[in-house]
Regions:
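Small/polar (Gly/Ser/Thr/Ala-rich) solvent-exposed segments
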Residues: 73, 93-117, 128-157, 177-179, ...
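Transmembrane beta-barrel architecture of outer-membrane proteins
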Residues: 58-60, 120-122, 168, 213, ...
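Amphipathic alpha-helical coiled-coil segments and their boundaries
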Residues: 68, 75, 130, 137, ...
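Small/polar, glycine/serine/threonine/aspartate-rich low-complexity segments that form flexible
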Residues: 36-54, 63, 101-126, 249-266, ...
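Short segments within alpha-helical structural elements
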Residues: 191, 220-248, 382, 390-449
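Bacterial Sec-pathway N-terminal export signals of envelope proteins
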Residues: 16-85, 258-286, 336-337
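Periplasmic alpha-helical coiled-coil/stalk elements that build and connect Gram-negative outer-membrane
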Residues: 137, 146, 152-269, 378, ...
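Sec-dependent N-terminal signal peptides
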Residues: 4-12
Length: 456
């Protein structure tokens, strides 16, 4: 009884020693994720992505990505692989059962006249079971579980990132389309102005300078179109790659037709952010795997006790084979004798590996809060910027209308009209970019809060 108590005490100390040396992460959560935003349990990340991105064409692209993206399929296969490996480790708890049989025929006194023949027949079942006194198998199983969960959470994080990447590329593509429409329409206006300037010059109404100015404006606008078309095609190829398809034309809406699904900033509680972000959960499981690896290294310093059981039949001929049962049991104790500190060094190294992983986990948490704060700043700024750009565009349009009227009345020169046209073109493009940035800021906020991987 005393020996049993001593053994149990040693086992308990083994587990405590590992947990004592594997220090918990130093994480102190703030009262609010963002100081300027009141803490609330409601969070935009809890909304399914299909309710955020309501455009059917964008939804189709996201669904294709979730079904066909090669990185996501690779991650899924990896999760399934680790699930199978976990079953292998779990099987170490069970006894290993085997079977063997043989027929042995020996001839003795080969050079003599009285040769003898010996026949031996056997059929046996074997059973080997390791008694996990010091938790070696238990720690190995914990490591396998943690690695599996780490990969599963990593798959969720990848899905979250891919949804954000597809949506971002989609809005960038729509913004490029809109910019191309603006410039194409401006080019038509420049062509009309060039025709009018040519007629005035040829009719002797003006000098050649206004005509040349009109040509410069037309050419400087026309040269923008090929560059935009190139950007559009490259962006389409980028989206096709994300969806797991060959380069193709991407069906999309017009950016001015799109409406945000939300108009309030709901960012939730700090504690919920830790739970919601799959990349943080993945880092946590990675930390647990390192602890389990340290526990395994600790258990490796102690003896392994294996019980071997063998039973069956063995005889010198077939006639009495089933009347000759055979059984025996062996308890095998294997222990390191002289390792010259190798196992202790391996355990110490595993502890240091845990510490390094702990610092990475703490960094991941800090990074998550930083990303949310940056996303909130960007979202607020982008909304204000879009409002200001709308006002700027309206003012530039009014300026252009007045300049055209005054030029017709001979009150200002043609160069003043050109200046007003440039201001309006720039204002239109800047507004288009501001609307794009507003949508992208929402996507980044949604992603930083951990939205996108949740199932309906």
């Amino acid at each position: 009884m005393k020996h049993l108590i001593l053994l149990l005490s040693i086992i308990a100390c083994c587990s405590c020693s590992v947990r004592k040396r594997c220090v918990e992460p130093d994480i102190t959560l703030p009262d609010q994720i963002v100081a300027e935003v009141d803490a609330d349990s409601t969070c935009v990340a809890d909304i399914h992505w299909a309710e955020i991105f309501t455009d059917p064409l964008l939804q189709n692209l996201i669904n294709k990505t979730l079904e066909q993206n090669k990185d996501l399929l690779t991650a899924s296969a990896r999760v399934q692989e680790l699930a199978k490996l976990h079953r292998m480790v779990k099987a170490d708890y069970a006894p290993a059962i085997g079977a063997n049989g043989y027929i042995e025929h020996e001839t003795h006194n080969l050079t003599a006249d009285d040769q003898t023949l010996d026949l031996e027949v056997a059929a046996k079942l074997t059973l080997a079971w390791e008694v996990d006194f010091f938790g070696r198998i238990r720690w190995a199983q914990k490591e396998a579980i943690a690695n599996y969960l780490k990969t599963a959470e990593g798959q969720k994080a990848l899905q979250m990132t891919l949804i954000a990447d597809v949506a971002t590329a989609y809005f960038e593509l729509m913004a490029l389309d809109n910019e191309l429409d603006i410039i194409s329409h401006t080019l038509e206006t420049r062509q009309e102005d060039l025709n009018k300037a040519r007629l005035r010059f040829e009719g002797g109404m003006t000098s050649e300078i206004p005509y040349q100015q009109a040509q410069v404006e037309y050419a400087s606008t026309a040269v923008l179109i090929p560059a935009l078309q190139r950007k559009i095609e490259i962006k389409e190829n980028e989206i096709a790659l994300l969806t797991g398809e060959m380069p193709t034309t991407i069906n999309r809406s017009k950016i001015h037709e799109y409406q945000l699904a939300i108009d309030t900033m709901m960012i939730g509680l700090p504690s919920d952010l830790i739970k919601r972000r799959p990349d943080i959960s993945s880092a946590e499981q990675s930390l647990k795997a390192k602890m389990a690896k340290a526990g395994y290294a600790w258990a490796e310093q102690f003896p392994r006790f294996v019980i071997n059981l063998e039973g069956g039949f063995e005889d010198y001929d077939f006639t009495g084979f089933f009347n000759a049962p055979l059984t025996y049991t062996i308890g095998e104790l294997t222990a390191p004798l002289f390792a010259f500190g190798k196992r202790k060094a391996k355990y110490d190294a595993a502890i240091k590996a845990y510490d390094a992983e702990r610092y990475q986990y703490e960094k991941k948490v800090l990074q998550a809060f930083s990303e949310v704060n940056n996303a909130v700043i960007s979202y607020s700024s982008a909304n204000k910027q879009a409002e200001l750009m709308e006002n700027l565009k309206n003012a530039a349009k009014k300026y252009l209308d007045l300049a055209q009227v005054q030029h017709i009345n001979g009150q200002i020169n043609y160069i003043d009209v050109l200046d007003a046209q440039r201001s309006y073109l720039n204002a239109e493009i800047d507004l288009s970019d501001a609307i794009r940035d507003k949508y992208i800021a929402l996507i980044e906020l949604y992603k930083s809060l951990g939205g996108g991987w949740q199932k309906e």
